[in-house]
Amino acid sequence: PGLVNTHHHLYQTLTRARAQEADLFTWLKTLYPVWARLDEEMEYAAARAGLAELALSGCTTVFDHHYVFPRGVTGLVEAEIRAAHELGVRIVASRGSMDLGESDGGLPPDSLVEDLDTILADTERLAAFANDDRVGIVVAPCSPFSVTTRLMEESAELARRLGLQLHTHLAETREEDAYCRELFGCTPVEYLERVGWVAEDVWCAHCVHLSDADVAAFAGSGVGVAHCPTSNLRLGAGVAPVRDLLDAGARVGLGVDGTASNERGDLFAEVKQALLVARGRGGGEALTARAALRLGTRGGAEVLRRDDIGSLEPGKRADVAIWRTDGLEFGGAEDLVANLVLSGSHRVDRLLVGGDEVVRGGALVHAREEEIAAEHRKQAARLWKA
């Protein structure tokens, strides 16, 4: 089955390999001023590049968490949806948000935060783009250190009224834990419970620093987790307790996260990475190759609450990823599925989304990779020059 990406930031393809030795907060503070120059043309180029890279790695469904809305700039989420439609990939887009700026104790600069009414009104407007198959919409305040308690509460109320899911970053770093304890007097998961988000219509990205009680709370309430192993290692955040979450019965899928904190939009690479970090944490039997592959397919579908994708069964969407197994890296392998996972990243040979070809012979069907890359370089240069 096609891979399912449960956490991404498409716009970040424009800012790869920056703040190379930074932790999360330093990395964000370095890049916030750059992202504040984002416009619709840049976003479209970034989305095309990011979605193309994901498709070539075998990904058929992408959740994108877009939370940067520079003042006066419109059409950013629509640009992502347009790019996904043109390439043929399924997208679950989001109306992310930040309303807690530096002057009020938040991390982002005041120039990148919006007011509550603007956020909620635009979220409701974008909800009309959702359909049952190719486009989904999620309500997604950014993080405890960039949004107010009121926005968390009112976002949940709006999402539930509209029948939409909720998503946020949570428990990614020790610095976030310290921030929540200082500002709210509780841990990130306790804060999530306080604002009414510990529920089955919620999934959270990262969840690296969870206690045993947190794991039990997520499993018991149905909160899903987007595991982003490469990004978490790149920023020195740590390793999520995925084996504990799975043993407790929690929903877990994989995410690339932004390609500014991962540098590769390759979801299949995350399958192997998930296996490696699980074994590094829990030993050689902590996660099998097939269990890791399940995280990237059926696990992701479960996190997104999609029962029509994630596996190849009668009645489900024909989301199919096909890899060749006659290359040098497969020589001597008896278990081809395990070797596909253990030998790492591979360009997909064919990719179908809902039965429609998106990749054929290792090349995009609906666009030229060279043209996407050239336009992306042009827009990245515009962003940095601005």
Which residues make up each language-model segment?
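His/Asp/Glu-enriched, well-ordered alpha-helical/loop segment
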Residues: 194-201, 243-327, 341-345
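Histidine-centered catalytic micro-motifs
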Residues: 2-13, 165-174
